[in-house]
Amino acid sequence: MISNRRWMVAAVLGVALLAGGRDAYSQEKRAYKIGSVFSVTGAGALLGERMKMTVEMMVDQINRSGGINGHPVKLIVYDAASDVTKAVAATNRLITQDEVDIISGAGNMSGLSLAMKPVAMRHGVPMISNAGARPIVEPIDKSSWAFKSHLTDKEIVGRAIDWWKSKGITRVAMLSDTSGFGTSARDELKLQAPGAGINVVAWEEFDAAANDLVPQLTRIRAANPEVILCWTVAPSGVVFMKNARQLGMKQILMHGFGYVVPKYMEMAGDAAEGTVLVSLRFPVGRQLPDSDPAKKVILDYTREFKAKYAQEPDVYGAEAYDGMLMAFKALEAAKGFDKEKIREALERLNFVGTNGIYRFSPQRHYGLTKEDAVVMEWRNGDWKLLMGAETK
């Protein structure tokens, strides 16, 4: 006859085994939760719209193919409305209420990503930004949970300087907005210009919501630069192009990678013709040589997006595409839900995306280099490649 004590031990073990079985079953069926914060309204809406569409398409595709390591993927997306406060609130909600395993898509604007970063750091949740400002991932000892699918403004500014030097240009003016995006690039040009023999003859700033840049451009005209580099993602960049041509300015007009949006060029009309931009590979993907490893990824993504939405993707959607690839690959490599292992997997990534060859390390939380950037021109309603992306 079984004693009461032995019966109780057996009962406890039985309950534990049942609980363990339920936990194992629960773990087997548990979905990976990926959070995204994009601005699909507000000043950054033109950037965020196709980013959101892209990640929704990708999650649908991976779930139809069986998920990641047999786990389904759940995507949770919030609109930051181009507002820092809303971006931070959305990040807190993703982490504390939705309990996401990773964030891929951090605001789609540098200022928003910079505001979201401390939240991810505080909670120990991997965050992948699609924005450009260098401080998103540096210094590395204060960016352990922050990664990005984009170049930093260090490489983009460096690529602009390469093009200036190839054309014998030495006199440049910079007109940047006062956001984190504009300020970061301004600081970068200050660092790089002197050593490259570039004389920045005028520094001007403007509010991202500005609708008149004539005063700044009048001062720039007096300094007689060869090129005017504007740095913004806001519609005020259209005002820059229109005002410059209205003033009869003949200088080369140039935008950074925040303005690779055909809609913005169309809004500027004839004033945009000949504008030079520094960008990631995607907009000129069809013009890349077949030997470029990113070309096939670009064409495949473009075909998939057009098949689903009956419209063309853009470079911002491509950035979100590469960012979500990062998330998928890291989750697959981590083989579980341990956020530290997911973070470590991100540091080991090496893959080809739409915008180049990504190589990450514990010391480098963005995978692209200056050679992944291109210089292009808006000509006759399309992008024309001026300086290509070298294969690493």
Please state what every model-predicted region is.
Residues 2-14, 20, 24-392:
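Extracytosolic ligand-binding ectodomains
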